[in-house]
Design a protein with these regions (language model features):
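Bacterial Sec-dependent N-terminal signal peptides
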Residues: 1-23
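Short, charged low-complexity linear motifs
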Residues: 10-13, 97-99, 194
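Central antiparallel beta-sheet cores of small beta-barrel/beta-sandwich binding domains
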Residues: 21-137
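Cysteine endopeptidase catalytic domains of the caspase/legumain-like
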Residues: 133-403
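Intrinsically disordered/low-complexity terminal segments and short unstructured peptides
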Residues: 7, 105-107, 150
């Protein structure tokens, strides 16, 4: 009896059965050198356990970038990639790294978390390394075709068409803040905020009508940079525009003052001088003359800025909410600590990506993912949505317009 062919087949197929994940497709995220972040994308083609493809690194403002080719392998639960050569490069601070990732998966996305390190090729990185994190959304399964069933085309009523046409004439502004690294050694650095901020910016600019020139992106800003951004918005935003503000980083609740604070990168644990209070944030939101302002805060104790309020909807009601000014906040929790690895932002971006309607309110998006956050957070995290106190809210709601 000859067993050699059987053993040969086992040798070929056993590695695939141990780790059968298909990495083919588009991955997007960040890499970090010191305290500086850049955006990284990989377009992977997989054959067996071998990988190849093209990638890009670019600065957060998009002005400097490099494009490159790579190959790699899947080794058990690790993905190992070697960047080979540039196809295009603008700027002088790029180098070609080796990348090592560990794969993980959640309900909403697949992740590659790891590091980049020195690479012994022409233009390769030398004696430097840093963190890297990529992700891609888990695609919804396409429904099976059903014989003799005709799906009616989705049609908007006149109210919906009016709203879409009105929103097309408006500008959508965004201030997106991610603080991962702190100067004070007594304040623990965070892994995710800048990565999450980049992820949200990409979703807003790709799927909704937020143009790049109207997005202010702040990576590890100090207090003055945040205040200057608020000042700029107060000058540029008009009474017909929409404004979204996102903050991810440390938050602190002062029980004596009964006040919450954001911690910019230059905050000190021993002094509140560089902290930004909820009161200051509220005052700026009130001063910015937008039609609708939506504040999204993914930080500990972020719920202290608002009063919870129920949301509802249909086309006619949505038009009425659009007509009325609003100052709303969506937060990752109440007066509790929240984890660095954010389930909140994961489900927020998932629902923004998967929304197929031309217009959707912030309240509708929130109601779709609130229960998922509660059910999938380790500490019973309860996200909040409601009115920002004393900020001139008149009962409206922020309306997203899909491209």
């Amino acid at each position: 009896m000859r067993l050699q062919p059987i053993f040969t087949l086992l040798a070929i197929f056993l590695p695939l059965s141990i780790f059968a994940q298909d990495f083919s497709g588009y991955w997007e995220g960040t890499n970090k050198f010191g305290k500086a972040y850049s955006i990284m994308t990989l377009d992977i083609q997989q054959t067996g356990m071998h990988l190849e493809g093209t990638g890009e690194q670019k600065s957060l403002d998009g002005k400097e970038y490099s494009k490159f080719t790579f190959n790699g392998v899947v080794d058990k639960d690790q993905v190992k990639i070697q960047c080979l050569a540039y196809s295009e490069k603008v700027g002088n601070w790029w180098c070609l790294p080796k990348l090592e990732f560990v794969y993980s998966k959640t309900e909403t996305e697949e992740r590659l978390d790891g590091k980049w390190k020195p690479n012994n090729v022409k233009n390769g990185c030398i004696l430097i390394s840093g963190k890297a994190a990529l992700s891609r959304p888990i695609q919804k399964a396409s429904p099976l075709p059903v014989a003799s069933v005709v799906t009616p085309e989705l049609k908007m009523d006149q109210q919906g068409e009016y709203l879409v046409n009105a929103l097309k004439e408006r500008k959508y502004y965004a201030l997106i803040i991610g603080v991962s690294d702190y100067e004070d050694e007594n304040i623990v650095d965070l892994d995710q905020p800048v990565h999450d901020a980049v992820n949200l910016r990409n979703v807003l600019s790709r799927y909704y009508t937020f143009e790049e020139e109207n997005i202010i992106f702040l990576q590890n800003p100090d207090r003055s940079s945040i205040i200057e951004a608020f000042d700029r918005l107060s000058e540029e935003v008009t009474s017909t525009d929409q404004l979204l503000i996102f903050y991810a980083g440390h938050g602190i609740w002062d029980t004596k003052l009964e006040q919450g604070f954001w911690l910019p990168s230059n905050a000190k644990q021993s002094s509140k001088a560089q902290w930004i209070s909820n009161g200051t944030i509220r005052d700026y939101i009130r001063a910015i003359d937008s039609k609708h302002t939506l504040l999204i805060a993914d930080a500990c104790f972020s719920g202290g800025i608002l009063k919870e309020r129920a949301a509802f909807m249909e086309s006619r009601a949505m038009v009425e909410l659009y007509k009325m000014p609003s100052r709303k906040a969506m937060t990752s929790g109440t007066l509790i600590t929240v984890p660095d690895q954010s389930v909140f932002i994961e489900y927020l971006t998932k629902n923004l990506r998967e929304n197929e309607y031309p217009v959707v309110t912030a309240g509708q998006i929130f109601n779709k993912f609130k229960i998922a956050v509660i059910n999938n957070s380790a500490n019973g995290q309860v996200p909040q949505y409601g009115v920002i106190h004393q900020a001139d809210d008149e009962g409206g709601d922020f309306v997203f317009l899909r491209r």
